[in-house]
């Protein structure tokens, strides 16, 4: 019998409401494994986080500095724009100063791909819509073979081949997939299999459909992303929706969150997407209630200060900052460190045990920060002993 609208229904054989929380599991599609530098992608390897510098690649010092910032923030593969020969050869001194794998982003001129490989890049991204003739692609493939480099076939709906636009009536998901397969066949014809594929669009729904179609038809590793997603707020939302849907289906071996911002800002969003799906974790998870009329402590300031204090932490643990007695004690007990607010007081938990009760709202922030500092000191000491 159907219940009232909005009433939760128990479906036999699905999940009993008395079973408690069931761990979220995602069955990732098994793709071929390739290696970019020292980073293995595809196969049984975890989803890898990528980004792209927005510096002038010819400015070696500035580019190296941004790569280091990206790496510190959690970036595992970095792509560089190669607009001309000077940019291609700038990769050589850049390569000597950074350890993260580098990908050269190539458009229009296949000779730049060859130069970038000779300069030491680990992989290429070529755009089927503008890389040139079959002969040009063949030369790129031969150079990639010689340097043991991966080639990403990077299809973009904004630069799709004109004949496919005409054939499909626009940059449809089907046209994007056909573009990818056209170039996959070119590479396979030269016995080249170190291939990765991406199908990017600024349309979330088009991205999802294109990647879903492609994933069903090939087992090459996929780099997923929503291109030209926008500024931090809108871009983060579009990326979270698009990438989240794909990752939930098990699709995606590397990802990038594309934001109109400092590329370092992409890292936090990318890692939170992975954390939210239980795929990977980096740094602390902060749980905080949205506040309501029951909240009787200065929760917003407390949560913001906790977040600020934990910037730069890379170890994974859970902190709960809760404002009232409804959900607060339960969430705080489950966290490594947590606080549950009450009337002009707060109860601080560590690993489920009450370690401190603080009276007076003005003392709450200072007391919790003391406990947080103690907790972090213990964590660091444990790491040092290991």
UniProtKB/Swiss-Prot annotation:
InterPro entries per UniProt: Dihydropteroate_synth-like_sf (IPR011005), IspG_bac (IPR016425), IspG_bac-typ (IPR004588), NO2/SO3_Rdtase_4Fe4S_sf (IPR045854)
Enzyme class: oxidoreductase
UniProt keyword annotations, A-Z: 4Fe-4S, Iron, Iron-sulfur, Isoprene biosynthesis, Metal-binding, Oxidoreductase
Pathway: Isoprenoid biosynthesis; isopentenyl diphosphate biosynthesis via DXP pathway; isopentenyl diphosphate from 1-deoxy-D-xylulose 5-phosphate: step 5/6
Cofactor(s) needed for function: [4Fe-4S] cluster
Gene Ontology BP annotations: isopentenyl diphosphate biosynthetic process, methylerythritol 4-phosphate pathway; terpenoid biosynthetic process
Enzyme Commission number(s): 1.17.7.3
Function: Converts 2C-methyl-D-erythritol 2,4-cyclodiphosphate (ME-2,4cPP) into 1-hydroxy-2-methyl-2-(E)-butenyl 4-diphosphate.
Family: Belongs to the IspG family.
Name listed for the protein in its UniProt record: 4-hydroxy-3-methylbut-2-en-1-yl diphosphate synthase (flavodoxin)
Organism, as annotated: Nitratidesulfovibrio vulgaris (strain ATCC 29579 / DSM 644 / CCUG 34227 / NCIMB 8303 / VKM B-1760 / Hildenborough) (Desulfovibrio vulgaris)
């Amino acid at each position: 019998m159907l219940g009232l609208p909005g009433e939760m229904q128990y479906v036999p054989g699905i999940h009993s409401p008395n079973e408690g929380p069931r761990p979220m599991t995602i069955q990732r599609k098994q793709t071929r494994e390739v290696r970019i530098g020292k980073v293995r992608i595809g196969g049984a390897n975890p989803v890898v986080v990528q980004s792209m510098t927005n510096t002038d690649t010819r400015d070696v010092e500035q580019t190296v500095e941004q790569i280091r910032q990206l790496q510190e923030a959690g970036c595992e593969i970095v792509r560089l724009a190669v607009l001309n020969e000077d940019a291609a050869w700038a990769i050589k001194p850049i390569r000597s100063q950074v350890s993260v794998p580098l990908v050269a982003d190539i458009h229009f001129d296949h000779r730049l791909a060859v130069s970038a490989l000779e300069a030491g890049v680990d992989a290429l991204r070529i755009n089927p819509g503008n890389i040139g003739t079959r002969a040009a692609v063949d030369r790129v493939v031969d150079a990639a073979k010689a340097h043991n480099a991966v080639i990403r076939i990077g299809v973009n709906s904004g630069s799709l081949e004109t004949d496919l636009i005409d054939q499909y009536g626009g940059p449809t998901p089907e046209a994007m997939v056909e573009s990818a397969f056209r170039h996959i066949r070119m590479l396979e014809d030269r016995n080249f299999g170190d291939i990765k594929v991406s199908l990017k669009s600024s349309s979330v729904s088009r991205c999802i459909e294109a990647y879903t179609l492609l994933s069903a038809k090939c087992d090459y590793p996929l780099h997923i992303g929503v291109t030209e997603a926008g500024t931090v707020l809108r871009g983060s939302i579009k990326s979270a929706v698009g990438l989240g849907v794909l990752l939930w289906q098990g699709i995606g071996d590397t990802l990038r969150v594309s934001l109109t911002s400092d590329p370092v800002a992409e890292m936090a969003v990318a890692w939170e997407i992975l954390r939210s799906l239980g795929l990977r974790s980096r740094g602390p998870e902060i749980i905080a209630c949205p506040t309501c009329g029951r909240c009787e402590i200065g929760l917003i300031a407390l949560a913001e200060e906790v977040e600020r204090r934990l910037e730069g932490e890379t170890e994974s643990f859970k902190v709960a900052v809760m404002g009232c007695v409804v959900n607060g004690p339960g969430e705080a007990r489950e966290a490594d460190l947590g606080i549950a607010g009450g009337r002009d007081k707060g109860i601080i938990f560590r690993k489920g045990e009450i370690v401190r009760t603080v009276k007076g709202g003005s003392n709450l922030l200072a007391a919790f920060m003391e406990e947080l500092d103690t907790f972090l000191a213990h964590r660091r000491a444990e790491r040092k002993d290991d």
